[in-house]
């Protein structure tokens, strides 16, 4: 797990997300506390529980983006889910325990990837031997093998096509037992059963020598790794370092005066309670305790309020962070300052057609103004509004770019207003088009 300081985490998030200092600080402290807990010993380590977070803020201000960037930073198993995807246990649909099963799968992939790095050198040599077997046969003399090995290492054989046998890891469907909630633990995974019975299934693939290396290195790495050890390590990592991000939590809050329980509302909240508090979930790899998994939840709370959540669930989300709506200055900074800003993306896309785009300062002001106006008059969708506006402005250039190779387009305020001004003024039209 990464041991960035809170200040480093915030500055890393600043590269991609504008504003929202409070939310960044909250997740940075939460992430650092995971590392601090790892440094403790014995009983105290068991007692320290993560402080779960509830992010509240309008759509398009960076709630989900903060979680995505945090996952990359953490180097820890991370799963993002929408609360609306789940139904109460006993109904058709996914139950909330599936979140933890997904987390374990992600942890296994993470641990396997790390372990593969440790055995990469040995796996590379084994892969080379298998390529030689495919080129000259297993019975070839050592002299022949050596001469081909030299050619291989010089890259002379890169384009030659060979047939290789690799283990077949194609996902075969799990049998699900109707009427049994949680039966999709993977009770009877037929490929596992067949694989063990027949000593591992393989399939033949045709590929060039150059392309065969990554496939064979992965295959050989897996042979060198102890799969049981990987699973045990992944279960430990899931329990100690796992982060679960639950989006749209406001959509499962019962609205005041609303009637009907709603299969995917209060029931889902009740099912989430033990998960967030700490329980043991059965997975096909073994039981996973959720006591030390960090839960970050977020919601826009346009219609409902955080107090509409079950009181017990509110109590289990002790850290509340409010994200502010974006201002005109924020829109300007989103267009220019972020690492892969929209303007940089469009310039890069057009360069593939040998078309040069230049944006003047007043164009950026105009784009920000239009986005703010539309958010105020139509519907506030935050930073996502910029994508709509940019697409509309660059529609003509994007369409004709292949015929205009070598051309340079300078986009200024006049151009922006010409393309979008009329629509922005006519509120009825902009409701449909922007």
Swiss-Prot record:
Q: Which residues bind ATP?
A: 18, 60-65, 247, 312, 384
Task: Give an example GO cellular component term for this record.
Answer: HslUV protease complex
What is any Pfam family matched here?
AAA
Q: Which CDD domains match?
A: RecA-like_HslU (cd19498)
Q: What is its main location?
A: cytoplasm
Q: Which cysteines are joined by disulfide bonds?
A: none
Domain of life of the organism in this record? Bacteria
Alphabetically, the GO molecular function entries are:
ATP binding; ATP hydrolysis activity; peptidase activity; proteasome-activating activity
| One BP annotation, GO | proteolysis involved in protein catabolic process
Question: Nucleotide-binding: is it a keyword of this entry?
Answer: yes
Localization, per the record, is: Cytoplasm
Q: Which UniProt keywords apply?
A: ATP-binding, Chaperone, Cytoplasm, Nucleotide-binding, Stress response
The job of this chain, per UniProt, is described as: ATPase subunit of a proteasome-like degradation complex; this subunit has chaperone activity. The binding of ATP and its subsequent hydrolysis by HslU are essential for unfolding of protein substrates subsequently hydrolyzed by HslV. HslU recognizes the N-terminal part of its protein substrates and unfolds these before they are guided to HslV for hydrolysis.
Q: How does it assemble?
A: A double ring-shaped homohexamer of HslV is capped on each side by a ring-shaped HslU homohexamer. The assembly of the HslU/HslV complex is dependent on binding of ATP.
The UniProt similarity line reads:
Belongs to the ClpX chaperone family. HslU subfamily.
Identification of the protein by name: ATP-dependent protease ATPase subunit HslU
Its lineage opens with: Bacteria, Pseudomonadati, Pseudomonadota, Alphaproteobacteria, Hyphomicrobiales
């Amino acid at each position: 797990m990464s041991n960035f300081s809170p200040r480093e985490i915030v500055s890393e998030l600043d590269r991609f997300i504008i504003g929202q200092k409070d939310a960044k600080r909250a997740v940075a402290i939460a992430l650092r506390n995971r590392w601090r807990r790892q440094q403790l010993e014995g009983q105290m380590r068991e007692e320290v529980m993560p402080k779960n977070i509830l992010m509240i803020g309008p759509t398009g201000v960076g709630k989900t983006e903060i979680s995505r960037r945090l996952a990359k930073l953490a180097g820890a198993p991370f799963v993002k889910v929408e609360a609306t995807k789940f139904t109460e246990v006993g109904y058709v649909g996914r139950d909330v325990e599936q979140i933890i099963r997904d987390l374990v799968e992600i942890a296994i992939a993470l641990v396997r990837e790390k372990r593969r790095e440790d055995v990469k050198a040995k796996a590379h040599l084994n892969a080379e031997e298998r390529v030689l077997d495919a080129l000259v046969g297993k019975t070839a003399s050592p002299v022949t093998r050596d001469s081909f090995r030299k050619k291989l290492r010089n890259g002379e054989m890169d384009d030659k096509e060979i047939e290789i046998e690799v283990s077949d890891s194609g996902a075969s469907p799990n049998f699900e037992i109707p009427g049994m909630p949680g039966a999709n633990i993977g009770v009877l995974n037929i490929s596992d059963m067949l694989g063990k019975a027949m000593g591992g299934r393989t399939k033949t693939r045709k590929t060039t020598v150059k392309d065969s290396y990554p496939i064979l290195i992965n295959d050989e790495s897996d042979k060198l790794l102890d799969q049981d050890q990987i699973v045990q390590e992944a279960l430990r990592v899931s329990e100690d370092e796992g982060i679960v991000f639950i989006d749209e939590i406001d959509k499962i809050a019962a609205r005041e005066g609303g009637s009907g329980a709603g299969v995917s509302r209060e029931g889902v909240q009740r099912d989430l309670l033990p998960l967030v508090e700490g329980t043991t979930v059965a997975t096909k790899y073994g039981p996973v305790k959720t006591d030390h998994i960090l839960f970050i939840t977020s919601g826009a709370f346009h219609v409902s309020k955080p107090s509409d959540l079950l009181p017990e669930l509110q109590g289990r989300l002790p850290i509340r962070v409010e994200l502010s709506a974006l201002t005109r200055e924020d829109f300007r900074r989103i267009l220019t300052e972020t690492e892969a800003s929209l303007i940089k993306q469009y310039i890069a896309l057009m360069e593939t057609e040998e078309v040069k785009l230049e944006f003047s300062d007043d164009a950026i002001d105009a784009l920000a103004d239009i986005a703010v106006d539309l958010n105020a008059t139509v519907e506030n969708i935050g930073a996502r509004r910029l994508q709509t506006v940019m697409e509309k402005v660059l529609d003509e250039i994007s369409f004709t770019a292949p015929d205009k190779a070598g051309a340079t387009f300078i986009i200024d305020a006049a151009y922006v207003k010409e393309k979008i001004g009329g629509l922005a003024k006519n509120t009825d039209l902009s409701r449909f088009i922007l």
